[in-house]
Amino acid sequence: MEHYEHVITSIVAMVVALGVVLAAGKPKIMPSKLQFVIESYINFCKSMVTENMGEQGLRYLPLIASIGLFVFFGNVMELLPFVDAPTGNINTTLALTLIVFFLYHFEGFRVNGLGYIKHFMGPIKALAPFFFIIEIMSHLGRVVSLSLRLFANMKGGAILLISIIGVLIGNPFTLAVSPIVLVFLITIKVLAIVLQAFIFMILSTIYIAGAVVHEEH
C-alpha cells in the first residue's frame, strides 16, 4: 500500500483544490474572503498567460491554474505529520511534467502545423541537423529538470525539516528554543511551498508559449 501512497495523496490534493474552488461559489458583489483569494489567484494566472502568450493564452488558463493549485496543495501536505507529499515523489512530478511536455508539443503542431518542426532547426539551414539534435536534447532536458526540481526541493526540504526537529526535541539544551526555531522553519517552508508552485506554473507557461507563439522577424 505504501508504494501507492503518492497516488492517494495526489487524489486528496486534487479533491482539496476542487473543494476550495467550489466553496468559493459564484462571483458576488461582496465576495467572501475565500472567493477574494480565488479570484485574485485566477487574475494572477490570467496575467501570467496573457503576458507570455497574449489573448490566445487564455486557452491554457484552466490548465495553468489547475497545475498551480495541485502543486500548492500537494506541497502543503508535506507539513502534515506522517504524510508523504505527492510532490515529494518523483512519479508524481514526472507525470505532471509529462502532461505539460506532451501538451505543449501537441499545441505546437496544432497551431503551427508541420512548421512547428522549424522551431528545432535553428537559423542556419546547413546546421539544421545539428540544431535539431541539440533542441531535442534540450526539450528532453526540460522533463528531467522540471520534474527533478520540484521533487528534490520538496523531498529534500521534508528530510531537512524532520532532521532539524529531531535534533531540537532530542536535546534538552535546544528544547527551550525549539518553538521559536520551528515557527521560523515552518515560515520558510511555506514560502518554499508557494515558490515551487509558482516556478512550476511559470515554466509550464513559458514552454507552452514557446510552442504556440509566433516569433516576429
Curated annotation (Swiss-Prot):
Q: Which domain of life is it from?
A: Bacteria
- Output the PROSITE patterns linked to this UniProt entry: ATPASE_A (PS00449)
Localization per record? Cell inner membrane
Any one GO BP annotation for this protein? proton motive force-driven plasma membrane ATP synthesis
- Please give, as recorded in its UniProt entry, the membrane topology of this protein: Multi-pass membrane protein
Q: Which UniProt keywords apply?
A: ATP synthesis, Cell inner membrane, Cell membrane, CF(0), Hydrogen ion transport, Ion transport, Membrane, Transmembrane, Transmembrane helix, Transport
The GO cellular component terms are: plasma membrane; proton-transporting ATP synthase complex
Bilayer-crossing regions: 5-25, 63-83, 89-109, 120-140, 157-177, 191-213
Q: Please report a single Pfam family linked to this protein.
A: ATP-synt_A
The answer to keyword Transmembrane helix applying to this record is yes
| GO MF terms held by the record | proton-transporting ATP synthase activity, rotational mechanism
Task: Give the UniProt family note.
Answer: Belongs to the ATPase A chain family.
Its assembly, as annotated, is: F-type ATPases have 2 components, CF(1) - the catalytic core - and CF(0) - the membrane proton channel. CF(1) has five subunits: alpha(3), beta(3), gamma(1), delta(1), epsilon(1). CF(0) has three main subunits: a(1), b(2) and c(9-12). The alpha and beta chains form an alternating ring which encloses part of the gamma chain. CF(1) is attached to CF(0) by a central stalk formed by the gamma and epsilon chains, while a peripheral stalk is formed by the delta and b chains.
Q: What role does this protein play?
A: Key component of the proton channel; it plays a direct role in the translocation of protons across the membrane.
Record-given protein name:
ATP synthase subunit a
